Curated annotation (Swiss-Prot):
Identification of the protein by name: Uncharacterized protein MJ0766
Domain of life: Archaea
InterPro entries given in the database record: CGGC_dom
Family: To M.jannaschii MJ0582.
Matches recorded under Pfam families: CGGC
Length: 66
């Protein structure tokens, strides 16, 4: 298990880190934090990030792992 941040808007830093975790460490599932999915306003980049992560081959859960 790894915990990283999204890297701030628009999430490119987080996507790069996730790509490495999938490729090098075999990560299979990514959980989005509450700040991206439940707080108001919700992250406007969350859906796009979800699509990009799924293209990398990982499952995305739109809620925290806690």
């Amino acid at each position: 298990m790894s915990v990283i941040t999204c890297g701030g808007c628009p999430g490119r830093l987080g996507l790069n880190q996730i790509k490495q975790l999938i490729g090098k460490n075999g990560a299979e599932v990514v959980h989005f934090a509450t700040c991206m999915t439940a707080f108001k306003p919700k992250c406007r980049y969350a859906e796009k990030m979800k699509e990009e992560i799924e293209k990398m081959g990982a499952k995305v859960v739109m809620s925290s792992h806690f």
